[in-house]
UniProtKB/Swiss-Prot annotation:
It catalyses: a 2'-deoxyribonucleoside 5'-diphosphate + ATP = a 2'-deoxyribonucleoside 5'-triphosphate + ADP; a ribonucleoside 5'-diphosphate + ATP = a ribonucleoside 5'-triphosphate + ADP. The gene is ndk. The keyword tRNA processing does not apply. It comes from Hamiltonella defensa subsp. Acyrthosiphon pisum (strain 5AT). It is found in: Cytoplasm. PROSITE patterns: NDPK, NDPK_LIKE. This is Nucleoside diphosphate kinase. The lineage of its organism: Bacteria, Pseudomonadati, Pseudomonadota, Gammaproteobacteria, Enterobacterales.
Length: 141
């Protein structure tokens, strides 16, 4: 199996619920190492640049309002098949459709406030990691 890196955001509503530690425990239990992390308050410009591929979608405005409503916790995760593994533990985008025991089922409230963002491919992971992290801020362990 290939060791990969993926990108994750714990969204503002989940941050305000004080579940960062619980989510980090789930990452580590799933053998996803946290190799870099930051807490940020995204500007509208940062959020629009990050989610640029959704610019023409109906939900774009709500997404930007939600992701900039408070601090986010961003992290780089590393492990075997990290992109797929992270997507599996996150669960479906809509927390109401996510399987019990997944992060979104346990910590998400709605389609917009679904607790987390995770890269959907290796190419996305590379782009998203580079958007927020410098090379010398990431430490494999």
């Amino acid at each position: 199996m290939a060791v990969e890196r993926t990108f994750s955001i714990i969204k503002p509503k989940a941050v305000t619920k004080n579940v960062i530690g619980a989510i980090y425990t789930r990452f580590e239990t799933a053998k996803l190492k946290i190799i870099s992390a930051k807490m940020l308050l995204l500007t509208i410009e940062q959020a629009e640049g990050f989610y640029v591929e959704h610019k023409n979608r109906d939900f774009f405005t709500n997404l930007i309002q939600s992701i900039t409503s408070g601090p986010v916790m961003i992290q780089v995760l590393e492990g075997e098949n990290a992109v797929k593994r992270n997507r599996e533990i996150m669960g479906e985008t809509d927390p109401k459709k996510a399987l019990a025991g997944t992060l979104r089922a346990d910590f998400g409230d709605s389609l917009t406030d679904n607790a987390l963002h995770g890269s959907d491919s290796l190419a996305s992971a590379e782009r998203e990691i580079a958007y927020f992290f410098k090379f010398d801020e990431i430490f494999s362990r």
